[in-house]
């Protein structure tokens, strides 16, 4: 059995060189064409062969599994407005709302018909003290007394003063008795008596709302509208002042501070003076 195995192994080994030499016409003398040996170790892989021709298209496979949901697409254009829907059924009444705010007072109605006189009531309580009577006749003149002189006349040097504050008339034209305070813009009464006050105010570019104030209370107010040109607002009054009373001018409305100053051709003046002093003035001689 073994010889046949060896023979089967030797025949291919002997035939391969002979066939190879015949194909190459290589029958050189001394060539070991008939040398036969056992198979050697496996050689390294050869280089990849050239790609073969494309095969025929295979059969269609089975449908694959559903893929994951894709991202939302861009919002499409708005469609045309559809026809109005049918009117729905009337809903149930809602809960009672909160009470609304009190409305504005309506116009005053016409005077009604006089009613019938009522019954006489019981006598009331004693009323309050009446108002002070009219001043009496002027007393004797004390003109020339150094203690009764009080007069001032002052002007401004700036335009558009601040609102609701005493206007500082810091240009002193006269200050007899020294009762006008230029730093505060106030006249402080030093001689009790009857005083006359007047003002002439130039305005430009804005409206002017100015008032004369006595101890924090407006005594007179003047409003002058700006018409595009320069204008003058005036006011005057007589006041009974006590020792320490204060009098000044101020703007009484927002954005209406059109007082205008020009150093070359216009002034705004505030003036006041004592007409006569009180008879019980301790300074009176």
From Swiss-Prot:
InterPro entries: C1q_dom, Collagen, Collagen/C1q_domain, Tumour_necrosis_fac-like_dom. One of its GO terms (cellular component) is extracellular region. It comes from the Eukaryota. Residues 1-15 form the signal peptide. Expressed in adipose tissue. Residues 40-141 form the Collagen-like domain. Residues 145-281 form the C1q domain. Gene3D superfamilies: 2.60.120.40. The keyword Transmembrane helix does not apply. PROSITE patterns: C1Q. Residues 66-78 have a biased composition (Basic and acidic residues). Residues 41-51 have a biased composition (Pro residues). It is found in: Secreted. Keywords: Collagen, Secreted, Signal. One of its GO terms (biological process) is regulation of lipid metabolic process. Residues 53-65, 84-120 have a biased composition (Low complexity). Residues 33-144 are annotated as: Disordered. May interact with ERFE. PANTHER family: COMPLEMENT C1Q TUMOR NECROSIS FACTOR-RELATED PROTEIN 2 (PTHR15427:SF28), EMILIN ELASTIN MICROFIBRIL INTERFACE-LOCATED PROTEIN ELASTIN MICROFIBRIL INTERFACER (PTHR15427). Involved in the regulation of lipid metabolism in adipose tissue and liver. This is Complement C1q tumor necrosis factor-related protein 2. It comes from Homo sapiens. The lineage of its organism: Eukaryota, Metazoa, Chordata, Craniata, Vertebrata.
């Amino acid at each position: 059995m073994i010889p046949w195995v060896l023979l089967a192994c030797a025949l291919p080994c002997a035939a391969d060189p002979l066939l190879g030499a015949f194909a190459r016409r290589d029958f050189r003398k001394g060539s070991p064409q008939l040398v036969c040996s056992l198979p050697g170790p496996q050689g390294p892989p050869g280089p990849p062969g050239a790609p073969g021709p494309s095969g025929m298209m295979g059969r269609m496979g089975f449908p694959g599994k559903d893929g994951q949901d894709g991202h939302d697409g861009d919002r499409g254009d708005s469609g045309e407005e559809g026809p109005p829907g049918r009117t729905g059924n009337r809903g149930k009444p809602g809960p009672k709302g909160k009470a609304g705010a009190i409305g504005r007072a309506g116009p005053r109605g016409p005077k009604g018909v006089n009613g019938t006189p009522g019954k006489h009531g019981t006598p009331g309580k004693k009323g309050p003290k009446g108002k002070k009577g009219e001043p009496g006749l002027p007393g004797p003149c004390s003109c020339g007394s150094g203690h009764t002189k009080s007069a001032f006349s002052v002007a401004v040097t700036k335009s558009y003063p601040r609102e609701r504050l005493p206007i500082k008339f810091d240009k002193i034209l006269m200050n007899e008795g020294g009762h006008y305070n230029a730093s505060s813009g106030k006249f402080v009464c030093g001689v009790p008596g009857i005083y006359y006050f007047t003002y002439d105010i130039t305005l430009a570019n804005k409206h002017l709302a100015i008032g004369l104030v006595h101890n924090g209370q407006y005594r007179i107010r003047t409003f002058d509208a700006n018409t595009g040109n320069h204008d003058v607002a005036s006011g005057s009054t007589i006041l009974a002042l006590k020792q320490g009373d204060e009098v000044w001018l101020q703007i009484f409305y927002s954005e209406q501070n059109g007082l205008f100053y020009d150093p070359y051709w216009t002034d705004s003046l505030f003036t006041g003076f004592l007409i006569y002093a009180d008879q019980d003035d301790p300074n009176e001689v």
